[in-house]
Amino acid sequence: MSDKKLVNVTLVKSTIGRLPAHKACVAGLGLRKMHQTVAVIDTPENRGMINKVSYLLKVEEA
């Protein structure tokens, strides 16, 4: 996995009251709690989920 480009994603806003599809995107990225940070591989699929819920996230290049 070291040769793959990673992106650090942090959940900074709550998913309470959000659309079910947006909650699913957050879960798909591996985020469960606020202020939790995960490193995800930079793929078009993950970028699509990040773009869909970008208003809930903080994204940094790893």
From Swiss-Prot:
Keywords: Ribonucleoprotein, Ribosomal protein. GO terms for molecular function: structural constituent of ribosome. It holds the Pfam family Ribosomal_L30. GO terms for cellular component: cytosolic large ribosomal subunit. It comes from the Bacteria. One of its GO terms (biological process) is translation. InterPro entries: Ribo_uL30_ferredoxin-like_sf, Ribosomal_uL30_bac-type, Ribosomal_uL30_ferredoxin-like. Part of the 50S ribosomal subunit. Belongs to the universal ribosomal protein uL30 family. This is Large ribosomal subunit protein uL30.
